[in-house]
Amino acid sequence: MQRDYWYTVARDGNLLDRMVDVGRTAAERTIRRLGGQKLKTCKVPVLFSAELAGGVIGNLMAGISGGNLYRQSSFLLDHLGKQIFPEWVHIHEQPLLKGGMGSGAFDGDGLQTYVKDFIKDGVLANYLLSTYSGRKLGMPSTANAGGARNLFVDSNAGDQKALLKQMGTGLLLTELIGHGVNIVTGDYSRGAAGFWVENGEIQYPVSEITIAGNLKDMFMQLQAVGNDVDRRGNIQTGSLLIDGMTIAGN
């Protein structure tokens, strides 16, 4: 037996997907997972589908949040101004975007929000600070009490099909299970399911595996960001192709 899901979110009700389309997508995603196989333990490139990619970027934001930093509970402590991604990576906040899922003119402290870079040319350009956490760190607030608003990860590649071709052989991830991310150390280990890919083509579904790595390594080994952006949340990113993650299976 297999299961999957799909959903639709929009600020404007007229932009919601039709119920029949949501149901059909959920059914199609479930059916294609039938016959899932285990993999032998290996180290291969991993493509995080767009709906999962936002979680990886969310781990970044947890690592640069003021609360974790002043408690010295972050793997990115003292990394401001340092290279943590390849030079082409750009991650920025657009809090005043009309119709954006996370738009807001003011943060939780009442400070006016503004456009800013968090990652520019691969370098950590800003922490994520409220008035309180900024004071604890001896730094000004970045007007991010309550978190980031409308975070964008710029694409440097095509859609998911193009990224599969670029990957060649590896794992396409479509589900992550559990909460095995340690923000203090950056260690990353989660149950997963998806599809085995060879020569850029999906071969068969896989299940009952674990993917593992370290967020610092994952960030630096980012190979591509797709243009297949999942626009349903506060973090807007396409699929993420990351080189050399460990897959634990049989």
Question: Model-found features: residue ranges?
Answer:
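Dual-mode signal for accessory low-complexity, basic/Gly-rich regions
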Residues: 23, 77-250
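Internal alpha/beta scaffold segment
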Residues: 1-60, 64
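Intrinsically disordered, low-complexity segments enriched in small/polar residues
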Residues: 3-5, 68, 125
